[in-house]
Amino acid sequence: MTEDSWHPICELGAVPEHDLIGVEDDGCELIIVRLDGDRHFVLDGRCTHGKASLAEGFVVGDEIECPKHNGRFDVATGDAIARPVTVGLGTYQCRVRDGKVEIRR
């Protein structure tokens, strides 16, 4: 992929440390998770079980907890790690450049 395939989806300052926010990119709901200041992750924004918005969810350690049925996903891999979820989330390459969180899609 070329350098041009990266594009910004939000300002870094919009994502609180050890928390997440929801964003929309080209019609897709995504979440951005910020851990320990410089670790950022971008994942699909809907739970694979009950379709709840994960933007309303919680960061618990290195996991995302769904607000609807308390299923959990691994922040780094998107893997489903606590029932009732059994299907993982899609993940996207991300980086921080010039104060913005960028993804490659």
Where are these regions (language model features)?
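N-terminal pre-ligand scaffold of iron-sulfur
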Residues: 1-61, 75, 79, 87-105
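Short cysteine clusters
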Residues: 47, 66-69
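Short Gly/Pro-enriched loop/turn and capping motifs at secondary-structure junctions
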Residues: 72
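Short glycine/proline-centered loop/turn elements that form peptide/ligand docking sites
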Residues: 83
